[in-house]
Amino acid sequence: MSTETHDEPSGVAHTPASGLRGRPWPTLLAVAVGVMMVALDSTIVAIANPAIQQDLHASLADVQWITNGYLLALAVSLITAGKLGDRFGHRQTFLVGVAGFAVTSAAIGLSGSVAAIVVFRVLQGLFGALMQPSALGLLRVTFPPGKLNMAIGIWSGVVGASTAAGPIIGGLLVQHVGWEAVFFINVPVGLAALVAGLVILTDARAERAPKSFDVSGIVLLSGAMFCLVWGLIKAPAWGWGDLRTLGFLAAAVLAFAGFTLRESRATEPLMPLAMFRSVPLSAGTVLMVLMAFSFIGGLFFVTFYLQNVHGMSPVESGVHLLPLTGMMIVGAPVSGIVISRFGPGGPLVVGMLLTAASLWGMSTLEADSGMGITSLWFVLLGLGLAPVMVGTTDVIVSNAPAELAGVAGGLQQSAMQVGGSLGTAVLGVLMASRVGDVFPDKWAEANLPRVGPREAAAIEDAAEVGAVPPAGTLPGRHAGTLSEVVHSSFISGMGLAFTVAGAVALVAAAVALFTRKAEPDERAPEEFPVPASTAGRG
């Protein structure tokens, strides 16, 4: 009987493969099932929020905390969670994350108050953070370098498919079962991932991984990420010049500065700054931020365009996004093969150029644009993003030493979170500014009668998301004209947002020129110093 063998990453110790345990492809299956649960949750919950608001008589702020509490917990703890995997083993960390995510999902479904839901959503975010870096860490230490891209490609395809399925599955569950089912669905998926993980995954950790925790570094980094992400989340509502926004962003800068100073002096740092002496790793991190800025920030407006301008239901809008996600699902494994053969640089540059072209194409959409042209830009965007998601992840993870595989996975996920939050906030401000500039002129050109300042402000606010408010004091005969003014104002703002997103994607294409995959013998141990307390262990 043949035995599967491959070159293991240097400095990694794990239990020898036996049966299914420790085999690369079964490991990918087990990891993918767990990550599928997190990816599905990232889009499915948004569909349930209106039903939760109505059923529990929640305020808009309460519902926002259901989403923001999860996002904050996730963003704050990703790198620390990756460090836990490096220290205690990625298998154990992943399984704790899976079990905790499933249990908190069940608790949310059983909750009878918004406060309880928010608490469990925060816990859910913490457990989700345990899973994602550990998943990449397990792939890094299980797959040989020549097949890692393919594994990441399939993993990315699963994430894309689950994300795409979220609105469709969520809409069906909310409509036919209830909002609780959106969370209960994680329980059987979590049990499947837990059983698969217990049977298949093997303990894997780097022999040279530090044995202590940089508590000061954890506190400073967590505080910096919290202030940064929260400031970006609230900036559109508070205003960029508001003292609260400036205060949180200033606190983030100070905390990051303190974290950098701490890491430069720590014996066993949370995230060794020497990692960033690797130009490809640094470029990959910047590229991930820029990609998320343009993609997530731009995609934020697509939902409003489909639902508020074209009048689609959440399920229908999810279906119309399938050309985008379908190309990502198909393209991710193919991209893994191409990158394995030719390296990441070329595919990443081409991918970001396609992304820029598709975003600029979407900037030309009008209120009456057909779904054919919209789908064309979605297909092009999916083809562009597929190699970027795979290649950037591989560049970051493969250029970090094996003992920091979890930290590298957390860095990759954190870069995406920060980029997405920054893109949504900045493009949202540009969108609102453009709508505010063109709305009065379009109102006057349409010869609509004057309304009171409060009603005019409410209509303009609705126009920022393409929603047509009730006519209010306007005579009913003006309803059609009001709709045209609102939609044309929204389209103008969306066009500017997509234009800027495309420009950022073009900058990302230039950054991609500095990326490459690390060779197995290229990274000398002294480039990433090992603490004296752990040197020589093994």
Swiss-Prot record:
GO terms for MF = transmembrane transporter activity
| Transmembrane portions of the chain | 28-48, 65-85, 100-120, 126-146, 154-174, 181-201, 213-233, 239-259, 286-306, 319-339, 342-362, 371-391, 413-433, 494-514
Q: Please tell me one Gene Ontology term that the record gives under cellular component.
A: plasma membrane
Provide the topology term for how it sits in the membrane. Multi-pass membrane protein
Domain of life of the source: Bacteria
InterPro entries, from UniProt? Answer: EmrB-like, MFS, MFS_dom, MFS_trans_sf
- Where is the protein situated, by its record's location annotation? Cell membrane
The record ties this protein, via NCBIfam families, to: efflux_EmrB, MFS_efflux_tcmA
The record, for PANTHER family, names:
EXPORT PROTEIN (PTHR42718:SF42), MAJOR FACILITATOR SUPERFAMILY MULTIDRUG TRANSPORTER MFSC (PTHR42718)
Name of the protein in its database record: Tetracenomycin C resistance and export protein
Q: Which organism is it from?
A: Streptomyces glaucescens
